[in-house]
A protein has these predicted regions:
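Dinucleotide-binding Rossmann-like beta1-alpha1 core, especially the glycine-rich loop
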Residues: 49-124
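Beta1/beta-strand and adjacent pyrophosphate-binding region of the FAD-binding site
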Residues: 1-13, 31
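Short loop/edge segments at beta-strand edges and connector loops
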Residues: 34, 87, 121-122, 168-170
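Helical element adjacent to the flavin cofactor pocket in flavoenzyme catalytic cores
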Residues: 138-171
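Gly/Ala-rich phosphate-binding loop of Rossmann-like dinucleotide-binding domains
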Residues: 18, 22, 158
């Protein structure tokens, strides 16, 4: 068979590329190849699972915009495909004055990027997490965690349901 597109690599990037291509071009023959016996066995399967809100990116930058869109689209995909995730937020802690100054900068950056964030003093930090020692920090409410291997498997399922061809154990 001749394919219009062949995507090599069954991690989250390869899988999401194949799935997006199939959504945009349903008439095209698309093949996803993965050398391992399961999807997302390497980097995707070994990351921390954080759905990043974009705390560190310059206001108005493409990275900031993509993070904002990515949080929403990742959670929407999870909701639509019964993939559990935890919108637990992310706590960044300052342990000295210099880091506390950086927290203020990050807090401002988050506000400019329209990220829901809370600036915490030492008492607020301690009440949120009694085992943390710090001068303060920020709590990024939009951050979440998910098992990206589960996301990957569901995405491959959607890709195949749309007529895509996905093959494991292929080099």
């Amino acid at each position: 068979m001749i394919f219009d597109y062949i995507i090599i690599g069954g991690g989250i990037v390869g899988i999401s590329t194949a799935w997006q291509l199939k959504q945009r071009f349903p008439e095209k023959d698309i093949l996803l190849l993965e050398k391992e016996s399961i999807y997302s066995m390497h980097q995707t399967g070994h990351n921390s699972g954080v759905i990043h809100a974009g705390v560190y990116y310059a206001p108005g930058s493409l990275k900031a915009k993509f993070c904002k869109t990515g949080v929403a689209s990742t959670m929407a995909f999870c909701d639509q495909n019964d993939v559990p995730y935890d919108r637990c937020g992310k706590l960044l802690v300052a342990t000295n004055e210099l880091e506390m100054e950086r927290m203020h900068v990050l807090f401002e950056r988050c506000q400019q990027n329209e990220i829901d964030v809370e600036l915490l003093g030492a008492k607020q930090l301690k009440s949120r997490e009694p085992n943390i020692v710090g001068l303060g920090g920020i709590f990024v409410k939009e951050s979440a965690i998910v098992d990206f291997q589960q996301v990957s498997v569901k995405m491959v399922d959607r890709f195949v349901e749309m007529g895509g061809d996905a093959r494991l154990n292929h080099k």
